[in-house]
């Protein structure tokens, strides 16, 4: 289900404030955030945002193609190690 257009995109207010401070200051520092649900807006383009994946912060460099997506899409939370092979089937 898509978000209502009259509500606008969700961006955590502190994340938005930190990105605006980075832009105003002219520095390209990394902004840490736990807000994986925040939508990437055109203001974020060119910024590096460290998104928490539950264990560590994954740096995400925002490009124009990412606008409209959520930050959590670019910070995977699970690492698939593969199914058990023939070697591991009998051992326990």
From Swiss-Prot:
GO biological process, one term: ribosomal small subunit assembly
SUPFAM superfamilies recorded: Ribosomal protein S19
Keyword Repeat listed: no
Matching PROSITE patterns: RIBOSOMAL_S19 (PS00323)
Residue numbers spanned by region Disordered: 73-92
Compositionally skewed regions (Basic residues) per UniProt: 80-92
Short name of one Pfam family: Ribosomal_S19
Entry annotated with the keyword Metal-binding: no
Record-linked InterPro entries: Ribosomal_uS19, Ribosomal_uS19_bac-type, Ribosomal_uS19_CS, Ribosomal_uS19_SF
Keywords: Ribonucleoprotein, Ribosomal protein, RNA-binding, rRNA-binding
Molecular-function GO term, any one: rRNA binding
Signal sequence range: none
Superkingdom as given in the UniProt entry: Bacteria
GO annotation, cellular component aspect: cytoplasm; small ribosomal subunit
Family statement drawn from the similarity comment of this UniProt entry: Belongs to the universal ribosomal protein uS19 family.
Function: Protein S19 forms a complex with S13 that binds strongly to the 16S ribosomal RNA.
HAMAP family cross-referenced by the UniProt entry: Ribosomal_uS19
NCBIfam families: rpsS_bact
Protein name: Small ribosomal subunit protein uS19
Gene name per UniProt: rpsS
